[in-house]
């Protein structure tokens, strides 16, 4: 009889303990759900502020719609060829009627002090369709200036079909350049709603691409290749976002302003691929071509240095 009482007490005790644990579980789950809800309801700005991530760039909030743009590579007209031939300070060759490679008669020094404006102005004195290009940067790994072509007053990032590369010697003088030109763009489909700049920044934050104490220094709309086929490219409106981790480290991200896809482009990797492609094209010039002889050696030397860097 006494054993029966003890057994009953044990059963009741276990029931009370189980009920207590169930209540504890529900309470913890409710607290966790509320924390998730609070986090999801906090704005992007609040999340960035909590990690001391600042936005110094102005945000283009008035731009709400844009469309994909289909562009073919331009083939040089007789007028283009005449203009190119009229440039007295260089010797040019044209390959496949769409790729210019030109060697300056004498190296041309860059204006000092080096600024984006002064370098761009100097380069534009020597190329076709000069007003359509803007300086992206100076790649010190290869000592090459990159200029991207604009379409609809917006830069087209990292495409071989609308690109000027200016090669510099050890004294930072321009020795030769290559150029490709995009044709006129045509809207593909109707206008689409754009992801706003703060949403694009939020996309990077949610991916873990933005870290505590970093600064968003620039966000601008341009175009980035979405589809590339032979001779035709479809460019998507794209937010280019520049992040500064410290005074010496800067990263660029490209967020598709319609679909939210994120791309990263490294200028050295891009240049290496472009130089290899250009080298194969230049080898189609006549063996006795002075342009081929000079540029082929320059590209071989730079690619060899870059290959050595990759192997280290």
Give the role of each language-model region:
Residues 157-158, 185-194, 264-266, 274-277:
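A short, polar/proline- and glycine-enriched secondary-structure boundary/capping micro-motif
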Residues 162, 176-181, 190, 201:
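Structured extramembrane domains adjacent to transmembrane segments
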Residues 124-170, 220-255, 266-267:
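Exposed beta-strand-loop-beta-strand "reactive/processing" segments of non-cytosolic proteins
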Residues 179-185, 270:
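Short, solvent-exposed aromatic-acidic interface loops
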Residues 1-134, 143-155:
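Preferential activation on post-signal-peptide N-terminal prodomains/segments
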Residues 168-173, 179:
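Non-catalytic, structured segments within soluble enzyme domains
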Residues 197-312:
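Extracytoplasmic/luminal low-complexity segments enriched in Pro/Gly and acidic/polar residues
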Residues 96-144, 153, 185-227, 287-294, ...:
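Short, non-transmembrane alpha-helical segments in secretory-pathway proteins
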């Amino acid at each position: 009889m006494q054993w029966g009482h003890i057994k009953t007490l044990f059963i009741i005790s276990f029931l009370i303990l189980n009920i207590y644990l169930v209540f504890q579980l529900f309470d913890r789950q409710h607290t966790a759900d509320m924390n998730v809800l609070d986090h999801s309801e906090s704005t992007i700005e609040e999340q960035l502020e909590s990690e001391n991530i600042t936005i110094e760039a102005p945000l283009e909030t008035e731009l709400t719609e844009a469309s994909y743009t289909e562009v073919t590579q331009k083939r040089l007209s007789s007028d283009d060829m005449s203009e190119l031939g009229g440039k007295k300070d260089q010797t040019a060759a044209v390959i496949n009627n769409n790729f210019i490679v030109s060697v300056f008669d004498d190296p041309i020094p860059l204006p000092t002090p080096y600024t984006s404006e002064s370098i761009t102005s100097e380069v534009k004195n020597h190329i076709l369709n000069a007003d359509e290009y803007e300086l992206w940067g100076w790649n010190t790994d290869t000592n090459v200036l990159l200029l991207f072509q604009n379409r609809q007053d917006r830069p087209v990032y990292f495409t071989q079909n609308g690109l000027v590369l200016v090669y510099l010697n050890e004294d930072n003088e321009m020795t030769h350049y290559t150029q490709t030109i995009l044709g006129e763009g045509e809207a593909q489909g109707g206008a689409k709603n754009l992801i706003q700049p703060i949403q694009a920044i939020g996309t990077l934050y949610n991916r873990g691409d933005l870290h505590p104490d970093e600064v968003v220094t620039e966000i601008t709309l341009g175009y980035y290749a979405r589809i590339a086929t032979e001779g035709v490219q479809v460019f998507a409106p794209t937010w280019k976002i520049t992040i500064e981790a410290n005074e010496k480290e800067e990263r660029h991200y490209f967020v598709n302003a319609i679909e939210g896809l994120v791309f990263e482009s490294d200028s050295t990797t891009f240049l290496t691929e472009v130089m290899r492609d250009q080298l194969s094209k230049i080898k189609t010039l006549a063996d006795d071509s002075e342009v081929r002889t000079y540029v082929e050696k320059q590209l071989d030397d730079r690619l060899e240095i870059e290959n050595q860097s990759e192997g280290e």
